[in-house]
A protein has these predicted regions:
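Short, Lys/Arg-enriched N-terminal segments with co-localized hydrophobic residues
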Residues: 6-20
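Active-site acidic carboxylates
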Residues: 18-114, 129, 159, 174-183, ...
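Distinct, well-ordered alpha-helical segments
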Residues: 93-100, 123-124, 149-151
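Short phosphate-binding loop-to-helix
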Residues: 112-125
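Short, acidic/turn-prone active-site loops that include or flank metal/cofactor-
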Residues: 114-115, 165-168, 195
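Glycine-rich phosphate-binding loop signature in dinucleotide/nucleotide-binding domains
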Residues: 127-133
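A contiguous pocket-lining binding segment that forms or flanks enzyme active sites
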Residues: 134-186
């Protein structure tokens, strides 16, 4: 009797496991309201040494870590990427920080004189050329080079997602005020971790899982997943 009861319990557990691990089919990216690798693109604006040095809304090492991590997410999920700098060709500014050049050096960089990237024709044509309506935007400063193109893109019918912990301003007040203004205009605020998880969404999508593991990294060096694995070895 006990063996029969154990067998029934085992069958129920197996059935429960199968039921709880049945993933839905991947949604149609054309109609999915969430970010997917097929319906979104990634924009990086003005992560140059002077701009990074002027950030006062968060620790600069954390900012650099977060923009590098967000960029790695875009590369992992093969998003179209548009990278822009300001005033490099005029000699008034330096190229993007080395950490981003290492990741994006194989892509075109659209250098501008306009403060608002959306008012640069080459930049705007590059963005529109990919034909995607969901724009994941990162830029320095939040209150200028992120806010201006984000507000313009919203006016032209795009959906804009600002990665709030991968951008920064000249003060906490400037950063937060710009985020409020953008949100009031319809910009959607997301975080670095949310970006990774929204693009991945299912551990069964194994091709991107190795890159997805970067979601557990932190700027202070702590990795929760690695710490958990190490604790299980003792």
């Amino acid at each position: 009797m006990r063996d029969a009861s154990n067998q029934r319990s085992s069958r129920r557990l197996t059935l429960f496991t199968r039921l709880t691990m049945a993933s839905e089919k991947i949604r149609n990216p054309a109609t999915d309201h969430l970010l997917t690798p097929e319906n979104s693109m990634f924009i990086v604006i003005d992560y140059q040494p002077v701009q990074v040095a002027s950030i006062r809304s968060m620790p600069r090492d954390e900012l650099v870590f977060n923009i590098v991590s967000a960029t790695k997410a875009a590369l992992n999920y093969k998003l179209p990427i548009v990278h822009s700098t300001v005033n490099v060709k005029t000699g008034l500014n330096r190229p993007a920080i080395n950490e981003l050049q290492e990741l994006l050096g194989h892509l075109p960089t659209y250098d501008r004189t306009t403060v608002n990237a959306w008012e640069d024709t080459e930049f705007k044509e590059a963005v529109k050329g990919f034909g995607r309506k969901k724009l994941i935007m990162t830029a320095l400063w939040t209150e200028v080079c992120l806010a201006f193109p984000a507000l313009d893109a919203i006016q032209e019918g795009f959906e804009v997602y600002a990665v709030v912990d991968a951008v920064g301003g000249t003060s906490v007040a400037a950063h937060e005020t710009a985020l409020r203004r953008m949100e009031q205009a319809g910009v959607k605020l997301i975080s670095r971790v949310q970006l990774y998880c929204e693009l991945q969404r299912d551990w069964a999508r194994k091709d991107t899982v190795p890159g997805f593991m970067n979601v557990f990294e932190n700027h202070d060096g702590f990795n929760a997943e690695k710490a958990f694995q190490e604790s299980n070895q003792h």
